[in-house]
A protein has these predicted regions:
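N-terminal accessory regions of nucleic-acid-interacting proteins
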Residues: 2, 142-206
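Catalytic cores of nuclease domains that cleave nucleic-acid phosphodiester backbones
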Residues: 2-55, 59, 187-216, 223, ...
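Alpha-helix N-cap recognition
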Residues: 8, 160-165, 235-238, 308
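Conserved DEDDh/DEDDy metal-dependent 3′-5′ exonuclease domain
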Residues: 21-32, 36-38, 43-110, 230-330
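A residue-level signal for conserved active-site and pocket-lining positions in enzyme catalytic cores
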Residues: 67, 126, 149, 211, ...
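Acidic, Mg2+-coordinating catalytic module of metal-dependent nucleases/exonucleases
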Residues: 102-139, 312-368
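Generic beta-strand/beta-sheet core signal
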Residues: 210, 225, 258-261, 350
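Polyanion-binding interface signature
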Residues: 216-219, 227-229
Length: 368
């Protein structure tokens, strides 16, 4: 168990991360559990650990505790820890502050022994998600299907409705409320293993796809895919507001913007707060934008257990070049800020793949 994914492991002890965070890894046995964590360096009896987050959290203490156990088992002296967080913020912890928390740390770790496979948002970054969800479906757990929750199933039960029977008749599905109807179509798609088109939607032919990478509150990379050309705009300095070139490019191209989820458009709109003179152009650029995720939620159902861009695009045959995800980008960019400039290419590749995957999905949807 990689303790850097503690919150995921608490939801499901079988969680297997898709991305291994940078650092020197070690394993340590705590009360019969083989746990894994990492550290940046061991220097002057101090263990240095790099994590994301703006403030020191309890899971950081657990991470430090595992490192303490590992180094003391190696016969090394430990006086304390340095936890480096977002934007170079460093928290220094003396060993006695950690030891005081040992009972609560062990209590939290013991919870991992009592866990069971429980599908949820934590599944997004799990390597065995597809196989696991398939097994759960065979056992009758319908909650792995998007839009199917315990509450939705309870509602069907109170209505004396068997959803597995209803999905055999499309006309019957149309009689339900909108959120129930979408849940039933998603279920039908999974069990029939085919994509379902629920509504007619005119999709654009001439457009620019864009995707934004964010670190903390800093939107540092705006990537655009115009036809087959990838055009990135990198804003390394969070205090510089030199957005003119990017806004002029979009304004001159005068094409519909396509994105996946609302984060990207929010990032563009946020620019107007720093540069109010660009507001009218930004509003014009975004007035006819298309959220492909919204299209998918409303107009299609797919035989997958997650509607993330990665899962939908992989279903349509898209191949990603990196193991990064939205959260992993934080840790990789953190390495860049610490001086490892070589990692930036991986972020560019990931951002470009996000754009190309979005276009790939959009073009596939046009075939239905």
């Amino acid at each position: 168990m990689d303790i850097l994914y503690l919150e995921n492991l608490k939801q499901c002890p079988d969680f297997v991360e898709t991305f291994k965070r940078p650092g020197k890894y070690f394993k340590v046995n705590i009360e019969g559990m083989e746990l894994e964590a990492n550290y940046e360096k061991y220097e002057d009896n101090m263990i240095h650990i790099v994590r994301t987050g703006n403030n020191l959290r309890f899971y950081h203490w657990i991470h430090a505790y595992l490192a303490y156990k590992y180094f003391t088992e190696q016969g090394k002296k430990v006086d304390g820890f340095v936890i480096e967080l977002v934007d170079g913020k460093k928290e220094k912890i003396k060993l006695d502050r950690l030891i005081i928390r040992e009972p609560n740390i062990l209590k939290e770790l013991r919870k991992l022994k009592k866990g069971y496979r429980n599908p949820g948002s934590h599944c997004r970054f799990c390597k065995i998600k597809t196989e696991c969800h398939r097994e759960l479906l065979k056992k009758g757990d319908l909650t792995v299907i998007p839009s199917i929750s315990e509450k939705v199933l309870k509602d069907f039960e109170m209505m004396n409705v068997d959803p597995l029977e209803v999905i055999n008749n499309r006309d019957e599905i149309d009689d339900f409320r909108s959120f129930q109807r979408k849940a039933l179509f998603n279920m039908k798609s999974v069990f029939e293993d085919k994509t379902l088109k629920l509504n007619e939607r005119k999709l654009p032919d001439d457009y620019i796809v864009f995707d934004v990478e964010t670190y903390g509150n800093h939107d540092f990379l705006f990537g655009f895919l115009d036809n087959d050309e990838y055009i990135p705009f990198f804003f390394e300095d969070a205090n510089k507001n030199d957005f003119e070139e990017m806004i002029e490019y979009l304004d001159n191209r005068n094409k519909k913007l396509v994105h996946y989820d609302v984060h990207d458009t929010k990032a563009l709109r946020k620019i107007a707060k720093f540069r109010p003179e660009l507001r009218s152009k930004i509003d014009k650029i975004l007035e006819d934008s298309l959220d492909l995720f919204d299209v998918i939620l409303k107009d299609f159902s797919f035989p997958v257990t997650s509607y993330s861009l990665k899962d939908i695009s992989k279903y349509f045959g898209f191949e990603w070049r990196t193991n990064l995800n939205g959260f992993a980008v934080l840790t990789v960019y953190q390495r860049y800020l610490k001086g490892d400039k070589s990692v930036m290419q991986e972020i560019y590749d990931y951002n470009e793949d996000d754009c190309r995957a979005t276009r790939h999905v959009l073009e596939e949807l046009k075939k239905f």
